[in-house]
Amino acid sequence: LPPCLEIDSGDCVVVDTVTGGPEHIPPENKGFHVPSELFDIHRDCPAMLPGHILTGPIAIKGALPGQVLQIDILDIKLRQNWGWNIIRPLAGTLPHEFQTARKVTIPLDLKTMTAELSWGLELPLNPFFGVMGVAPPRNWGRISSIQPRAHGGNIDNKELIAGTTLYLPIFEEGALFSCGDGHGAQGDGEVCVTAIETALSGRFRFSLRDDMALHTPQAETPTDFITMGIHEDLNRCTEDALRNMINLITAKTGLSREDAYMLCSLAGDLRVTQTVNGNKGIHMMMKKSLLEKAA
C-alpha cells in the first residue's frame, strides 16, 4: 500500500484507530459513542482479506531493509466508551468446546479506567495496540493481518502499553508502519480469541536504528527487556523467545551463553503472549537491573 504519511526519523505522530465489524457496533440508543469513521470504513472500504482495520502505513524517510524501527509508545488513549468481546465457534484456544457464538458489549469508564463486565465484575483498563507492524517482505505476497510474523503485526502482547518501546526489523523501504486492533484489557493468552476490543489513539515516536540487528520483534519496558518467539508451535515459540533473550544478554553484558542460559532459568519470566492467532506467541521478560549489575 502507498503510505498515507511520510515522516523523518525522530518525528512523533498521533494515530487514531477503530475496530470491529458492523455486527460489533452497539445499538444507537444505548448511549455508546461510535467514531464516525468506523461507519465510513464499512461503507467505502471492502475488506481485501480477513483481518483488522489498521491505520497506516506511515513511511519513515531513509528507512532501508536491514535496519530496525524503534517505536516509542508515548501515550495511548481510549476513543470510545465501550468495547466488545466474542466467542466464535471453531476459534480460540478451545475451538471445539464452545460451539455457541457469543458477543458482549462492555461499557468502559474513561474517568476511572475500568470496564464493567456483564456478570458483575469490574476490570482495570490497561490499553495497548494488538497490531503494530511494518510492511512484510514483498515476496510474501498479500497476507492477512491475523497471523503475527517477523514484521510484527498481530502480536497481542499486553506489555506494550504507554511508556514502552517496540523494535521491529525493517523489510521494505520506508518501513511502512501500521497499527490497530486496540485492546482495553487482555490476559496473557487472549484465550477466547478477543480482548476488550476498542478504538484507541496512540502517540508514537519513530526512530531508525543502524546499531541493531533483529530478525524478530523485541521490546522493552521501563523495567524489563522483552524477547519474543512467534510460530505455530508453542514449543518452538518458547525456544525462540529464550534463544533471543540469551543473545540479548550476551550482547549487553558479555556473559557467556552458558551463564546467560542459567540466568534465564533463575530470573527470566516466560509468558504466553497469545494462543489464538494461528501463529502463537511466547515472550520472555528479564529485569534490566540484573543486566546492569552483570555488565
Question: Each PLM stretch: what is its role?
Answer:
Residues H52-I53, D72-A162:
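Intrinsically disordered, low-complexity linker/loop segments enriched in Gly/Pro
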Residues G20-F32, I76-I86, G174-G184, T273-T275:
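Short, Lys/Arg- and Gly-enriched loop/turn segments at beta-strand edges
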Residues P3, G56-A59, D156:
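Short, conserved secondary-structure segments in the cores of folded domains
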Residues L125-N235:
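Conserved mixed alpha/beta catalytic, RNA-binding, or beta-rich assembly cores of soluble enzyme
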Residues L1-P46:
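N-terminal, Lys/Arg-enriched amphipathic/low-complexity engagement segments
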Residues V15, V68-I71, L168:
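A generic structural signal for residues embedded in beta-strands
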